[in-house]
């Protein structure tokens, strides 16, 4: 089942659609609680010209993963928050969290070196509906009140499950 819901290259487009739906849900909710001076980028490569800096090394962001799911940047406060969202088979939530953390930690270090306060928030949802233990706290760190964070967490969990149901139904059509 893990292979069908998360690992088969035949269903990659459906995995991406499920993931992008989660990104859209989270970004929509978080955007509402950010102040007007905060810019949001979705599925965008982090660029050096986003920052006020004195760095002369134009290749500082090269050779590291630098396309997170959601980025909020506030120039006035010199702060940046990166949201990375994952949808893994429920047994591998911790593995997915660690993988995402290790992937984007070099980007956080580069942005911090530019003089910005950078936060990395990882939200991992299970393809069968489980939610990683830090998702609620991550949504709150993004600015949501606890009740709203719980609502978004549950909505994303249900959305991931529905996405998995679509994948399973497609599998049953292809291999009856």
List where the protein language model places each region.
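Metal-dependent nuclease catalytic cores in nucleic-acid-processing enzymes
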Residues: 30, 101-116
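Short helix-terminating capping/connector loops at secondary-structure junctions
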Residues: 38-41, 113-119
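Alpha-helical interaction elements in eukaryotic regulators
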Residues: 4, 18-22, 26, 97-103, ...
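Short Cys/His-based metal-binding microdomains
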Residues: 1-30, 80
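Short beta-strand-loop-alpha-helix junction that forms the active-site gateway
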Residues: 67, 79-99, 125-127
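Active-site metal-binding core of divalent-cation-utilizing nuclease and nuclease-like domains
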Residues: 32-84
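Domain-level recognition of nuclease-like catalytic cores that cleave nucleotide substrates
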Residues: 118-176
